[in-house]
C-alpha cells in the first residue's frame, strides 16, 4: 500500500470516528454505566450521576471547553480529508462580543465543526482573543457522557439562556448559530445555495439586546460533499422525516457519498474543498427591547452583507458566475 493511500485511509477512519464515537457513547458507554450500578464498582457510576445532577446547568452557563480536546491530532486528519480551511476578511476585536451566522447548514456541518470546535484550522491564531462557541440543539446536553464530550469541543446550547450568558459575561465571545437550522438540511444538495433566513430573526433580536456585533459567514463546498435523496411532500418518506423531526429535533436525511474507494458509493463524504469565509462584523447598538422595525432593519442589513460576501467569493471557491444566493 502506497504512502498516499495509507494517509487517505487514515483520514477516512478519522472522519468515521467522529459520528461513531457518539454511537459508542450512547449504545456502549451509557449502558455500561448502568450495568456497573449492579456490581462492586457501583460507586463509580453513582459518583458520575450525582456529579451530573450538580453540573446540569453548565451547558447554559458557557459550557466547559478543553483546549486539549480541541487540539487532538485526529481533527487535523479530518481537516485534510476534504480539505477544510477558514478565510478571514477582517479582524474581530476582542473588546466586543459577536453572534456569527453560520451558513449553510449542510448535512453534517463539517466546516463549522472543524473551524469552530477544533483548532485544526487555527482559529485562535486567525482570530486572537476570540473564544468561539458553536450552538447546537439543547437536548444533546441532556445525554450523559455525550454532553461532556461536546462541551469539551466548545459547543454550547442554542437556548436563549445559554446565549444570553455568553454575551453578558466578559468580551471576546463569539457564538456561532446555524441560522437555517435542521430545516435547511433538506436544502443541502450539490450546486444549490438556498438559505432559510427571511423569517429567522431571533439571532438579530438577541444581538441587539446585548449590543453584540453580527458576523456573516458562508461555507463554500458544504453542500457539495454528499448527494441527498429528496422526497415529495406527499410521499410517505417525507411524512416519516417530518415525524422524525418532531420527535428528535432533526431530519432523518437519506444521503450518500463515496466508499473507501472513490469509484464506489458509501457514507464517506466526497473529497471536495470546504472553505468558510468569515465576513466583516456588522456593529449593532444595544437595544434592550428592540421593536420589530429595528429588528427588520438590521436583519435586512445582515442579509445584504451575507449576499455581498457570497458574491465577492463565489467564483473563486467553485460557484459559477451566474449562481445566486437564494433566501427563503
Curated annotation (Swiss-Prot):
Its EC number is 2.3.1.75. The chain crosses the membrane at residues 12-32, 34-53. It is an enzyme of class 2 (transferase). It is a multi-pass membrane protein. GO terms for molecular function: long-chain-alcohol O-fatty-acyltransferase activity. InterPro entries: DAGAT (IPR007130). Keywords: Acyltransferase, Endoplasmic reticulum, Lipid biosynthesis, Lipid metabolism, Membrane, Transferase, Transmembrane, Transmembrane helix. One of its GO terms (biological process) is lipid metabolic process. It is found in: Endoplasmic reticulum membrane. It catalyses: a long chain fatty alcohol + a fatty acyl-CoA = a wax ester + CoA; 1,2-di-(9Z-octadecenoyl)-sn-glycerol + (9Z)-octadecenoyl-CoA = 1,2,3-tri-(9Z-octadecenoyl)-glycerol + CoA; hexadecan-1-ol + (9Z)-octadecenoyl-CoA = hexadecanyl (9Z)-octadecenoate + CoA; decan-1-ol + (9Z)-octadecenoyl-CoA = 1-O-decyl-(9Z)-octadecenoate + CoA. One of its GO terms (cellular component) is endoplasmic reticulum membrane. Belongs to the diacylglycerol acyltransferase family. Acyltransferase that catalyzes the formation of ester bonds between fatty alcohols and fatty acyl-CoAs to form wax monoesters. Shows a strong preference for decyl alcohol (C10), with less activity towards C16 and C18 alcohols. Shows a strong preference for saturated acyl-CoAs. This is Acyl-CoA wax alcohol acyltransferase 1. The lineage of its organism: Eukaryota, Metazoa, Chordata, Craniata, Vertebrata.
Amino acid at each position: 500500500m502506497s504512502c498516499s493511500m495509507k494517509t487517505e485511509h487514515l483520514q477516512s477512519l478519522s472522519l468515521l470516528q467522529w459520528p461513531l464515537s457518539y454511537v459508542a457513547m450512547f449504545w456502549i458507554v451509557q449502558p455500561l454505566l448502568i450495568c456497573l450500578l449492579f456490581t462492586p464498582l457501583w460507586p463509580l457510576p453513582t459518583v458520575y450521576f450525582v456529579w451530573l445532577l450538580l453540573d446540569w446547568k453548565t451547558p447554559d452557563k458557557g459550557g466547559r471547553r478543553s483546549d486539549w480536546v480541541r487540539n487532538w491530532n485526529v481533527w487535523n486528519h479530518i481537516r485534510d480529508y476534504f480539505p477544510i480551511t477558514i478565510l478571514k476578511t477582517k479582524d474581530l476585536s476582542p473588546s466586543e462580543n459577536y453572534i456569527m451566522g453560520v451558513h449553510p447548514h449542510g448535512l453534517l456541518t463539517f466546516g463549522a465543526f472543524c473551524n469552530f470546535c477544533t483548532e485544526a484550522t487555527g482559529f485562535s491564531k486567525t482570530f486572537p482573543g476570540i473564544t468561539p462557541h458553536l450552538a447546537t440543539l439543547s437536548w444533546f446536553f441532556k445525554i450523559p457522557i455525550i454532553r461532556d464530550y461536546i462541551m469539551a469541543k466548545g459547543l454550547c446550547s442554542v437556548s436563549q439562556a445559554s446565549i444570553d450568558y455568553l454575551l453578558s459575561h466578559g468580551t471576546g465571545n463569539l457564538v456561532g448559530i446555524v441560522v437555517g437550522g435542521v430545516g435547511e438540511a433538506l436544502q443541502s444538495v450539490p450546486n444549490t445555495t438556498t438559505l432559510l433566513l427571511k423569517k429567522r430573526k431571533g439571532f438579530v433580536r438577541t444581538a441587539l439586546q446585548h449590543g453584540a456585533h453580527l458576523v456573516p459567514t458562508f461555507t463554500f463546498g458544504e453542500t457539495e460533499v454528499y448527494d441527498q435523496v429528496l422526497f415529495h411532500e406527499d410521499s410517505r418518506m417525507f411524512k416519516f422525516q417530518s415525524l422524525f423531526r418532531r420527535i428528535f429535533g432533526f431530519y432523518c436525511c437519506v444521503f450518500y457519498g463515496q466508499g473507501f474507494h472513490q469509484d464506489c458509493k458509501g457514507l464517506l463524504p466526497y473529497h471536495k474543498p470546504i472553505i468558510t469565509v468569515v465576513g466583516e462584523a456588522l456593529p449593532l447598538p444595544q437595544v434592550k427591547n428592540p421593536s420589530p422595525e429595528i429588528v427588520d432593519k438590521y436583519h435586512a442589513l445582515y442579509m445584504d452583507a451575507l449576499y455581498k460576501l457570497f458574491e465577492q467569493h463565489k467564483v473563486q471557491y467553485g460557484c459559477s458566475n451566474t449562481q445566486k444566493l437564494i433566501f427563503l
